[in-house]
């Protein structure tokens, strides 16, 4: 999609999240007067209850007219389509047993990886395009299954236009023996990482619009006492109409302490380039929602620069880049750092003066830079909250509190499983209970103590399996309609619901059965040669395995530049001790 022309109805749709609408549906042109700033003719934020969801997770619907004709459409990578075999069209009919006959009309495989398969489809009830992700062997590893449970639960509870939405989860055939799950999502076209790479002509209005959506979504998430903990451009889904949605809540956590702004989790492994300074070297024993605000600041700076702001090679290099730009922190900030060796490291650092933001971003709006300074404050207590940032003068004429709702903190009972040691059967039962939230009749029977649900409400998953198997078998065949490849090779990093691991041209299902083993070996070999000097703890399995249901990394055919970016940035499993002795000394208090 080209980057020129007036923004049309699709641009308005970000504020028209009605149940039957799709932010990825095609838009039609109309003639609007051009405005440099969006104009709101009316404002109302309503909440409607969805019968498939709990009462405390009402869907937010914005009902207002927005003229954003000053924006242009953004470029997003296009897919090559793999049309269905006309002789196999009948296999698209499924879910007849549970009253869902023909609801989802499968169109094409848009993603494939060790986790399973993603197919695009059309919901015949609403007409919107959706993505259906089949996750294989959910319970192979309890840790992965727990992460999936956490994300399914959070995405059910966090119902907001700026957070990716689960539309439906398919009923498994057996309560106690199922292994795979099928999750239906709204279909998004790309992610912010790809948008930044593909568009060198973004306007100040684009930047403002993007940041507004991120902060509005984050305000809602933080009001629920949820910390995302891994915000980065690849975890922000995007459409050509400029709509953004936050995804990948697999690392998110909910705070239940009496003081919800002071939390500590020992398993935190955020992507380094977007990691707040208090997380580098375990500087703070406690951290706050300000960790997400820092990440948003880094993302906003990347939009303005067209490249990452702090592309550190390791933790120490990351700190050096931060202090080179922001200056060394003042003594009062250093004094609040609990790690003694970290305090000594920063105290002994040569005095650095901050670089004026106007020098780093000479073409940026001064109001944007003043807000960016508030987002990138070194000391977390000095960072603006999402709510405060939305009230910044930068959003004058755009921000409206009635369109920026808050919510109640999530109940502690929802995440009681986090405090228990779970086995596979425990997680399976908890995920099954979450699936029933999308099947209200069965949920009612379940809550009454019914134990024969699969006999009362038969599952359509078996038919769905055959449908996915057919798609996988025909994906990439030389004679298949569409030219043998269903995904574009240049799509290397993706968040659901887009392609992950495109199979080589001409590869059959049998030939691709060992794709994970071969790709993992190739990645391991590449990393061994390119990371020899660093001794990094980069895991090939972790690159291939997608534990997140709404966003994940992938291995694809990468250019040298993209491969180096991935290796440098995506070392999510690094521990400080794996880098250098210097960093290890910071880690050990």
From Swiss-Prot:
InterPro entries: Kinase-like_dom_sf, MAP_kinase, MAP_kinase_CS, Prot_kinase_dom, Protein_kinase_ATP_BS
Keywords of this entry: ATP-binding, Kinase, Nucleotide-binding, Phosphoprotein, Serine/threonine-protein kinase, Transferase
Residues annotated with Phosphothreonine modification: 266, 271
Record carries keyword Lipid metabolism: no
Expression tissues: Ubiquitous.
GO MF, one annotated term: protein serine kinase activity
One Pfam family cited in the UniProt record for this chain: Pkinase
Summary of the knockout phenotype: More susceptible to oxidative stress.
Domain of life: Eukaryota
Reactions that this protein is recorded to catalyse: L-seryl-[protein] + ATP = O-phospho-L-seryl-[protein] + ADP + H(+); L-threonyl-[protein] + ATP = O-phospho-L-threonyl-[protein] + ADP + H(+)
Residues the entry annotates as binding ATP: 110-118, 133
SMART domains reported in the protein's UniProt record: S_TKc
Job description of the protein: MKK3-MPK8 and CAMs-MPK8 modules negatively regulates ROS accumulation through controlling expression of the RBOHD gene during wounding.
UniProt-recorded name of the protein: Mitogen-activated protein kinase 8
Organism: Arabidopsis thaliana (Mouse-ear cress)
